[in-house]
Amino acid sequence: MTSATQFDNVSVVKRANVYFDGKCVSHTVLFPDGTRKTLGVILPCALNFGTDAPELMEVQAGKCRVKLDGSSEWQTYGAGESFSVPGKSRFDIEVLETLDYVCSYL
């Protein structure tokens, strides 16, 4: 069962995913239906990420600005908001306040 604040009946990969010299750290959560999410934190910085699969980024806390590949406009997101990123693309993210996020791979 999943609630707004937790995921139940899941497995968690113990080894952390550490990117960009520790500016982005996450853990992978595996669900019984075969889907996966990562739960992570990004420290204030500016980064460029690449995606394989489409992603849904849900901001739990903090604040960021995002510019999707091919766009010239930045969008700002805060706690309770989310943004989607197409697969096989890139996006720029500027973290203004330490970002606590859930990333779903669609």
Swiss-Prot record:
EC number: 2.4.2.1, 2.4.2.2
CDD domains per UniProt: cupin_PpnP-like
Enzyme class: transferase
Keywords, comma-separated and alphabetical: Glycosyltransferase, Transferase
A GO cellular component annotation in the UniProt record: cytosol
InterPro entries linked to this entry: Ppnp, RmlC-like_jellyroll, RmlC_Cupin_sf
Pfam families from the UniProt entry: Ppnp
The keyword Thylakoid is assigned to this record: no
Reaction(s) this enzyme catalyzes, per UniProt: a purine D-ribonucleoside + phosphate = a purine nucleobase + alpha-D-ribose 1-phosphate; adenosine + phosphate = alpha-D-ribose 1-phosphate + adenine; cytidine + phosphate = cytosine + alpha-D-ribose 1-phosphate; guanosine + phosphate = alpha-D-ribose 1-phosphate + guanine
GO molecular function: guanosine phosphorylase activity; purine-nucleoside phosphorylase activity; thymidine phosphorylase activity; uridine phosphorylase activity
Keyword Transferase: yes
Family (UniProt): Belongs to the nucleoside phosphorylase PpnP family.
Role this protein plays: Catalyzes the phosphorolysis of diverse nucleosides, yielding D-ribose 1-phosphate and the respective free bases. Can use uridine, adenosine, guanosine, cytidine, thymidine, inosine and xanthosine as substrates. Also catalyzes the reverse reactions.
HAMAP family assigned to the protein according to its UniProt record, in alphabetical order: Nucleos_phosphorylase_PpnP
Protein name: Pyrimidine/purine nucleoside phosphorylase
